[in-house]
Curated annotation (Swiss-Prot):
Superkingdom per UniProt: Bacteria
One Pfam family it belongs to: SMC_ScpB
Listed Gene3D superfamilies: Winged helix-like DNA-binding domain superfamily/Winged helix DNA-binding domain
Role played: Participates in chromosomal partition during cell division. May act via the formation of a condensin-like complex containing Smc and ScpA that pull DNA away from mid-cell into both cell halves.
Protein name, as recorded: Segregation and condensation protein B
Family: Belongs to the ScpB family.
Organism: Symbiobacterium thermophilum (strain DSM 24528 / JCM 14929 / IAM 14863 / T)
Subunit structure: Homodimer. Homodimerization may be required to stabilize the binding of ScpA to the Smc head domains. Component of a cohesin-like complex composed of ScpA, ScpB and the Smc homodimer, in which ScpA and ScpB bind to the head domain of Smc. The presence of the three proteins is required for the association of the complex with DNA.
UniProt region (Disordered), positions on chain: 193-219
A GO-annotated cellular component: cytoplasm
NCBIfam families: SMC-Scp complex subunit ScpB
Alphabetical keyword list: Cell cycle, Cell division, Chromosome partition, Cytoplasm
Residue ranges that the Swiss-Prot or TrEMBL entry lists as coiled coil: none
Length: 219
């Protein structure tokens, strides 16, 4: 295969794929061994590092995706406004607890949050950000929840170890704070998303994350 033709095909695959492309999958589709597929990807990544390019190739969730460059984010946001429905504060807080304490049961999440999390869990399951990780060996064998590959993709992470360090204060229900700020680009993005407080109350109601905490329900 002519090398430039291979890069053209790889570029098309990255654009068309609904999920991060692994080197193994690229090799299978194009008909290369994995070593050559990795070299092809590295070469294409260099092409996208040129300052005039509006797109970049990022490694996340065990594969590669084609994304817009951070420098163009302001203009992309203008194009896409009004923004697609985001996650409510209740859903984000629940997701943060699951991400840092997984695998974890519903009762354990509610113990940390101090409110019921039924609707938040339903929202996160529908979005594919969390999944059933099995059953806990305890009375009633409750479901254990954990994050998914979609969670990594949603926050632009390669692996869970890139999550920013936090403290979950069980003495004050719902208190989850970063232990430090800054870090790499991915870490800053996750901090901004998980700890920014979510959408306004009207948006929370829209995605099933609203409720009255005074009645022991989701916020």
């Amino acid at each position: 295969m002519i090398w430039n033709h291979g890069k053209m095909i790889l570029e098309a695959l990255l654009l068309a794929s609904p999920e991060p492309l692994t080197i193994k999958r690229i090799a299978e589709v194009i008909g290369l061994d994995e070593r050559d597929a990795a070299l092809l990807m590295a070469d294409l990544q260099k092409d996208y590092e040129a300052p005039h390019r509006g797109l970049a190739i990022r490694e996340m969730a065990g594969g590669y995706v084609l994304t817009t460059r951070p420098e163009a984010a302001e203009y992309v946001e203008r194009l896409l406004q009004p923004k697609s429905r985001g996650l409510s504060h209740a859903a984000l807080e629940t997701l943060a607890i699951i991400a840092y304490r997984q695998p974890i049961t519903k009762a354990e999440i509610e113990n940390v949050r101090g409110v019921k999390v039924d609707r938040a869990l339903e929202t996160l399951l529908e979005r594919g950000l969390i999944e059933d990780k099995g059953r806990k060996e305890a009375p009633g064998r409750p479901i254990l929840y954990g994050t998914t590959a979609e969670f990594l993709r949603y926050f632009g992470l390669r692996e869970l170890s890139e999550l920013p360090p936090v403290e979950i204060d069980t003495s004050e229900p719902g208190l989850i704070v970063p232990t430090r700020t800054g870090g790499g680009e991915a870490e800053r993005e996750v901090q901004a998303s998980l700890f920014a407080g979510g959408e306004e109350p009207s948006a929370e109601a829209a995605d099933g994350g609203a409720g009255e905490s005074t009645h022991g329900e989701e916020e």
